[in-house]
């Protein structure tokens, strides 16, 4: 058997969709698991919809996910190759020029609609004589090129996920392989490219199943070996409809911008439709996935995308999996974008060390860590009622005095100091912690106040407490 080779072939017409990202991941893992080759091919034959900026973002997002490739192609740079193979099909009688106008074709479609039957081309131009073809060309009539589909033939293939699939050619009829503007169509170029690039396994979404018999016929007509096909089940939203924008963020880019970790997204997408051999385990590194991934473990039924599950998994990566230095490097751009001072890396590293278990994404981190970076904040009117009593004033004054003597440097030392103040002033724990939290953060809830006091520089704590004491006195 030849060396395994797979490909991912996105169109640069928008952001990288999560479903397409999963296809890329499965194709990549299958190739790497089998010590095979992986190809990235940009399918940009449609000049109207293909955009260079989308191509650049696709490449960035794939690299961000940790996917690398051995070969790279753009279909727009391969038109000469496609022309050569179109001519081969014309010469062998497997294709013919079609001079039908858009109006004539629309009339055929309308008749099919009236009869309530699926549309298939009538084959009107299939039997034109060479003289008629020549005459129409001389008259300057625009023409497409259609593939001549054998009538009433059942095309059969064994899908590696879906099993036995049989589709009759009468279901689709002769189809266009080159448009009247000279641009080749998807079903044609994909065959030429997959054959010339030596693709052994075509792994893609199940929405491509209707294309497969057409492509098999082209493989046969050109004398190319037919690759194996694996059609992945669709990804659904939690309402069991196809995953789309109405389910919220559906692109890799959106999750990048929300502060998701590439390793977590890669890991989670891999589990959509694939069952790891080790039951009950969900966290896998890319290297582990390469070792254990097999198409035989891909389910036939649709997978449901659960954003909360992804968020949980992302939190696990932030808390337990990623080295602190990696988390630091990824956190910096988010903190900078929020306008926080990031000049003291050691300070930020200490903040993250103590707080990484309190957020699941880096966008959550920005809100969570505000008290570590923002000194000027308003205390809401309704929170002053917690401060405006004698005990709160005494607690804040005692705390200020103590930290001027010696600032606690760990959460444990902060808790010890709070207990001493509680005992000395004969108050309950909330009467110590609540005034401190409000004075230092302007909030009733948030990151552990013992952590904030341990990490925040002494002069910042003094400044925040003094501001409240001055207002209370």
UniProtKB/Swiss-Prot annotation:
rRNA processing as UniProt keyword: no
Signal peptide: none
Cofactor: Zn(2+)
Catalytic activity: tRNA(Glu) + L-glutamate + ATP = L-glutamyl-tRNA(Glu) + AMP + diphosphate
Motif 'HIGH' region boundaries: 10-20
Primary site of residence: cytoplasm
Binding site residues for ATP: 245
Positions contributing to Zn(2+) binding: 98, 100, 125, 127
UniProt keywords, alphabetically: Aminoacyl-tRNA synthetase, ATP-binding, Cytoplasm, Ligase, Metal-binding, Nucleotide-binding, Protein biosynthesis, Zinc
Example GO biological process: glutamyl-tRNA aminoacylation
Location of the motif 'KMSKS' region: 242-246
Gene3D superfamilies tied to this protein: 1.10.10.350, Glutamate-tRNA synthetase, class I, anticodon-binding domain 1, HUPs
GO cellular component terms, semicolon-separated: cytosol
Highest taxon listed in the record's lineage: Bacteria
Note on cofactor: Binds 1 zinc ion per subunit.
Function in brief: Catalyzes the attachment of glutamate to tRNA(Glu) in a two-step reaction: glutamate is first activated by ATP to form Glu-AMP and then transferred to the acceptor end of tRNA(Glu).
PANTHER family associated with the record: GLUTAMATE--TRNA LIGASE (PTHR43311), GLUTAMATE--TRNA LIGASE, MITOCHONDRIAL-RELATED (PTHR43311:SF2)
UniProt protein name: Glutamate--tRNA ligase
Gene responsible for this protein: gltX
């Amino acid at each position: 058997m030849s060396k395994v080779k797979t490909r991912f072939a996105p169109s640069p017409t928008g952001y990288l969709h999560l479903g397409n990202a999963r296809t890329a991941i499965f194709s990549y893992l299958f190739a790497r698991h089998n010590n095979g080759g992986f190809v990235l091919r940009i399918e940009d034959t449609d000049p109207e919809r293909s955009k260079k900026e989308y191509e650049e973002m696709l490449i960035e997002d794939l690299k961000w996910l940790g996917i690398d490739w051995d070969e790279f192609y753009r279909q727009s740079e391969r038109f000469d190759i496609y022309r050569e193979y179109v001519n081969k099909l014309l010469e062998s009688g497997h294709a013919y020029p079609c001079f039908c106008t858009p109006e004539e074709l629309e009339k055929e479609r309308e008749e099919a609609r009236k009869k309530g039957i699926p549309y298939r081309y009538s084959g009107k131009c299939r039997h034109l004589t060479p003289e008629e073809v020549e005459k129409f060309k001389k008259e300057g009539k625009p023409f497409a090129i259609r593939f001549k589909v054998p009538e009433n033939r059942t095309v059969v293939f064994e899908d590696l996920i879906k099993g036995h699939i049989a589709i009759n050619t009468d279901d689709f009829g002769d189809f266009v392989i080159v448009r009247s503007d000279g641009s080749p169509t998807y079903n044609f170029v994909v065959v030429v490219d997959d054959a010339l690039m030596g693709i052994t396994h075509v792994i893609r979404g199940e929405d491509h199943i209707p294309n497969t018999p057409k492509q098999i016929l082209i493989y046969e007509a050109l004398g190319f070996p037919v690759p194996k096909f694996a059609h992945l089940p669709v990804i659904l939203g939690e309402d069991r409809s196809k995953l789309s924008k109405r389910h919220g963020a559906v692109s890799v880019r959106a999750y990048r911008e929300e502060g998701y970790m590439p390793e977590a997204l890669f890991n989670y997408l891999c589990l959509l439709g694939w069952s790891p051999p080790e039951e009950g385990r969900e966290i896998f590194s890319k290297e582990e996935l390469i070792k254990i991934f097999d198409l035989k473990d891909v389910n036939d039924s649709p997978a449901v995308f659960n954003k909360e599950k992804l968020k949980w998994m992302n939190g696990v990566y932030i808390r337990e999996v990623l080295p602190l230095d990696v988390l630091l490097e990824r956190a910096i751009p988010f903190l900078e974008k929020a306008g926080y001072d990031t000049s003291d890396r050691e300070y930020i590293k200490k903040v993250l060390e103590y707080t990484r278990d309190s957020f699941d994404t880096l966008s959550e981190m920005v809100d969570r860590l505000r008290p570590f970076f923002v000194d000027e904040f308003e205390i809401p009117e309704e929170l002053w009622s917690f401060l405006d009593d004698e005990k709160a004033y005494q607690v804040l004054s005692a705390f200020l005095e103590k930290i001027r003597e010696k600032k606690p440097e760990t959460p444990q030392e902060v808790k010890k100091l709070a207990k001493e103040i509680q005992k000395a002033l004969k108050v309950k724990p909330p009467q110590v912690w609540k005034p401190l939290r409000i004075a230092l953060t302007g909030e009733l809830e948030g990151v552990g106040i013992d952590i904030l006091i341990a990490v925040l520089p002494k002069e910042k704590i003094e400044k925040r407490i003094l501001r409240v004491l001055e207002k209370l006195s």
